[in-house]
């Protein structure tokens, strides 16, 4: 299942789960996972609603507003699909047919790819925003939302094509016991692929992942370098209250830097643990830990973004004060 839902550069399908090692026997793991999913769905729904209302009210959008809103939508859909799939892992066999299995796993793969792509795009856009006028990136500062949407649409189609082999390899688990199938959930399995097809697909996924992560790393390094240069240039200024106050751009930059670093670290962790689990610890418990860890970014990211939005922070503070006052009275 790991290489269908949570793809790493290791062997394409690394989790072989037989019928005697079902994860639904451990209710604590399932409850923890569904709690994480619930928190993530709440946070992404709130962030998406905020950006929709912001657009309806006619606020001038920042260059990063569209990717952030899109990322919240992607994570919301991804977590919903993950929760639906998880019911067939932790709870009971639903008896899904081929169409449901193919649709859910294929949709999840595409959403995971779009999450990686949008996160990478967000880091690049932030680097463009901070780039000085003398930089070659400054000419992209006036890029329109139309171009961003076209890029996202192109990448969406590309990911759909790359993942299209899942529409063939994913099937409903037959009643006949066989050792040739890799179990994705209790209802869905993977048909064995030829060595050539598996190698090509693994190579394409690895190239895509390494390219986008490298792009995030370079843009993050560029942002850090710009911030260090800016700090050196302002060191000679007198340390007044005004100079110590963070600008909105600096706050947004620090937020995105933190998320990019967290995303890269979680991706590296997923790759390492997935490879080790494939070679050494191919058991349900280690798999369930990985299942929990790789959704942390989608769960945490909306709250990090919202912490940088003054309107949301002020709204939550006022709501908190009202609840405290109601409890006191």
UniProtKB/Swiss-Prot annotation:
Record keyword Zinc-finger present: no
Disruption phenotype: Mice lacking all but one V1ra and V1rb gene (12% of the V1r repertoire) show a lack of chemosensory response to a subset of known pheromonal ligands and changes in maternal aggression as well as male reproductive behavior.
Record field: transmembrane: 33-53, 66-86, 110-130, 148-168, 210-230, 256-276, 286-306
Xref: PROSITE patterns: G_PROTEIN_RECEP_F1_2
Membrane topology: Multi-pass membrane protein
Location(s), subcellular: Cell membrane
Glycosylation sites: 175, 201
Protein name: Vomeronasal type-1 receptor 43
Gene (UniProt): Vmn1r43
Biological process according to GO: response to pheromone; sensory perception of chemical stimulus
Intervals, Cytoplasmic compartment: 54-65, 131-147, 231-255, 307-329
Any one of the GO CC terms: plasma membrane
Function field: Putative pheromone receptor implicated in the regulation of social and reproductive behavior.
GO MF term list: pheromone receptor activity
SUPFAM superfamilies attached to this UniProt entry: Family A G protein-coupled receptor-like (SSF81321)
Extracellular face of the membrane: 1-32, 87-109, 169-209, 277-285
Pfam family, one: V1R
Chief place of localization: membrane
Keywords: Cell membrane, Disulfide bond, G-protein coupled receptor, Glycoprotein, Membrane, Pheromone response, Receptor, Transducer, Transmembrane, Transmembrane helix
Xref: InterPro entries: GPCR_Rhodpsn_7TM, Vmron_rcpt_1
Entry's family note: Belongs to the G-protein coupled receptor 1 family.
Disulfide bonds: 101-188
């Amino acid at each position: 299942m790991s290489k269908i839902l949570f793809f790493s550069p290791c062997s394409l399908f690394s989790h072989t789960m037989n019928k005697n090692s079902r994860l639904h026997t451990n209710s604590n793991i399932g409850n923890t996972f569904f709690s994480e999913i619930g928190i993530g769905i709440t946070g992404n729904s709130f962030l998406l609603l905020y950006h929709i209302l912001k657009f309806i009210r006619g606020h001038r959008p920042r260059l990063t507003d569209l990717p952030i809103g899109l990322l919240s939508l992607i994570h919301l859909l991804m977590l919903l699909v993950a929760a639906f799939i998880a019911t067939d892992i932790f709870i009971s066999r639903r008896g899904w047919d081929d169409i449901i299995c193919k649709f859910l796993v294929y949709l999840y793969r595409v959403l995971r790819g779009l999450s990686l792509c949008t996160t990478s795009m967000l880091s690049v856009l932030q680097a463009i925003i901070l780039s000085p006028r003398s930089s070659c990136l400054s000419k992209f500062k006036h890029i329109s939302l139309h171009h961003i949407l076209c890029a996202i649409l192109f990448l969406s189609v590309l990911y759909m094509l790359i993942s299209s082999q899942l529409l063939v390899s994913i099937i409903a688990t037959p009643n006949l016991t066989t050792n040739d199938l890799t179990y994705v959930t209790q209802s869905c399995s993977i048909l064995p692929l030829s060595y050539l097809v598996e190698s090509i697909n693994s190579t394409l996924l690895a190239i895509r992942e390494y390219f986008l992560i490298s792009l995030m790393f370079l843009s993050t390094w560029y942002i850090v370098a710009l911030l260090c240069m800016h700090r050196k240039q302002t060191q000679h200024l007198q340390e007044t209250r005004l100079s110590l106050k963070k600008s909105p751009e600096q706050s947004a930059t620090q937020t995105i830097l933190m998320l990019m670093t967290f995303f890269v670290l979680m991706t590296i962790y997923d790759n390492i643990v997935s490879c080790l689990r494939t070679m050494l610890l191919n058991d349900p418990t280690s798999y369930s830990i990985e299942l929990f860890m790789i959704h942390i970014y989608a769960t945490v990211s909306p709250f990090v973004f919202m912490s940088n939005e003054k309107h949301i922070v002020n709204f939550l503070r006022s709501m908190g004060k009202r609840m405290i006052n109601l409890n006191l009275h």
